[in-house]
């Protein structure tokens, strides 16, 4: 089964074609046929496409919306220039899987998209106003392109965290605010966490119930999650992805009183304050330079700028602080797993975060940490009671697999 995996954003569309079926899932032999993305949708877009084993192609073209971006991708896939031998027409795409950010309390697992499911996603727009509307546009664009008979599946970022106990997801606010408006912790990066937990237990030959880890998904968005017996028991992101760790442009944890103070002092509306916390804070806000950790590390090596150094220190300190808190909540863990763009590619950041965790039994192997590149790798010393691993995430693979299972009515694996 050739599954088109889509991740629709406000001005971008990421896609992959993954060949998979129940037998391939069992053998862990899924095939990625191509991948790519469309950026700067709404103007002169940049379209990058790369078939399996083929050269990367980058072009620019006017793309006005998500539907036009998908149309461009599908025309490329069906053309002789794509290099994807398995796709010669739209009929060679058998299903579409979508990343959907917020499923609220309704969607506890992935779901075949029906009108009722689509309405449920729309009902969660208040919880994810920046994300769910774009996810819906991707679903509707695929329905228009393929017709209503094409099976589509929604895979929710929040679903993995529906196992949180109420003492972990409720805020210490008047209970009626939760009852009326469902104001609570939902957590995000769930598909990434689920994949990393699956890959870790596969590498270690563990059952789900034997999987006790802390994951650090570190990219432009960052989160820490405690996974006990294979299930999420607490996570740093909250009702929105703004809470928790320091991120590329998001503040993470703040004293709530700061919001009204900023509004008063700077003359900003609540919406403008929220936008500031989402787009002008984090690494960018502290450094005053960029939200890109790779650039910050390079700048620090060349100039030793105080604000850049401070941004990196605060980022690592907050992550280490969350590891300690989650270890206490779990009563200990077997491993800390790094994933995401920074987690997978910045050994210096991993080393900084783990420094000082010797009390918990974690000691980094400097050589292993430096060598890790694009593959799962233990980076702690063999004698460490608390291991550290790098495991590259693959959310698209899980979306494709969930799509197959949902369409065939197969239960999700433990």
From Swiss-Prot:
It is found in: Cytoplasm. PROSITE patterns: ACETATE_KINASE_1, ACETATE_KINASE_2. Its cofactor is Mg(2+); Mn(2+). Belongs to the acetokinase family. This is Acetate kinase. It catalyses: acetate + ATP = acetyl phosphate + ADP. Its EC number is 2.7.2.1. It comes from Solibacter usitatus (strain Ellin6076). One of its GO terms (cellular component) is cytoplasm. Mg(2+) binds at residues 7, 395. Pathway: Metabolic intermediate biosynthesis; acetyl-CoA biosynthesis; acetyl-CoA from acetate: step 1/2. InterPro entries: Ac/propionate_kinase (IPR004372), Aliphatic_acid_kin_short-chain (IPR000890), Aliphatic_acid_kinase_CS (IPR023865), ATPase_NBD (IPR043129). Substrate binds at residue 99. It comes from the Bacteria. Homodimer. GO terms for biological process: acetate metabolic process; acetyl-CoA biosynthetic process. Mg(2+). Can also accept Mn(2+). ATP binds at residues 14, 217-221, 341-345. Catalyzes the formation of acetyl phosphate from acetate and ATP. Can also catalyze the reverse reaction. The gene is ackA.
């Amino acid at each position: 089964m050739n599954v088109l995996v889509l991740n629709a954003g406000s001005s971008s569309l990421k896609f992959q074609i993954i060949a998979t079926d129940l037998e391939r899932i069992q053998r862990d032999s899924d095939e990625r046929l191509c991948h790519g993305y469309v950026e700067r949708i709404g103007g002169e877009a940049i379209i990058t496409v790369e078939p399996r084993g083929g050269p990367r192609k980058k072009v620019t073209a006017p793309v006005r919306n998500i539907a036009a971006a998908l149309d461009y991708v599908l025309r490329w896939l069906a053309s002789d220039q794509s290099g994807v031998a398995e796709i010669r027409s739209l009929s060679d795409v058998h299903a579409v899987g979508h990343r959907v950010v917020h499923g609220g309390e309704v969607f506890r697992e992935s779901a075949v998209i029906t009108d009722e499911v689509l309405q449920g996603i729309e009902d969660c727009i208040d919880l994810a106003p920046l994300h769910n509307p774009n996810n819906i546009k991707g679903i509707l664009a695929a329905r228009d392109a393929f017709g209503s008979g094409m099976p589509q599946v929604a895979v929710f970022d929040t679903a993995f965290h529906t196992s949180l106990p109420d003492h972990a997801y409720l805020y210490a606010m008047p209970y009626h605010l939760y009852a009326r408006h469902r104001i609570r912790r939902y957590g995000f990066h769930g598909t990434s966490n689920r994949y990393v937990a699956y890959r870790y237990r596969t590498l270690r030959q563990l059952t789900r119930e034997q999987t006790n880890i802390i994951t650090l998904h570190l990219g432009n968005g960052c989160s820490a999650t405690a996974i006990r017996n294979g299930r999420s028991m607490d996570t740093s992101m909250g009702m929105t992805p703004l809470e928790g760790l320091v991120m590329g442009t998001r503040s993470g944890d703040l004293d709530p009183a700061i919001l009204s103070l900023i509004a008063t002092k700077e003359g900003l509306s609540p919406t403008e304050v929220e936008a500031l916390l989402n787009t002008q804070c984090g690494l960018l806000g502290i450094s005053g330079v960029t939200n890109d950790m790779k650039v910050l590390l390079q700048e620090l090596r060349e100039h030793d700028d105080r604000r850049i150094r401070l941004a990196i220190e605060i980022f690592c300190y907050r992550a280490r602080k969350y590891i300690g808190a989650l270890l206490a909540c779990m009563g200990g863990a077997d491993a800390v797993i790094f994933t995401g763009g920074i987690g997978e590619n910045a050994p210096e950041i991993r080393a900084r975060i783990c420094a000082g965790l010797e009390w918990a039994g974690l000691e980094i192997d400097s050589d292993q940490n430096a060598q890790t590149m694009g593959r799962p790798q233990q980076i702690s010393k063999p004698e460490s009671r608390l291991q550290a691993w790098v495991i590259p995430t693959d959310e698209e693979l899980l979306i494709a697999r969930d799509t197959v299972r949902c369409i065939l009515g197969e239960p999700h694996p433990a």
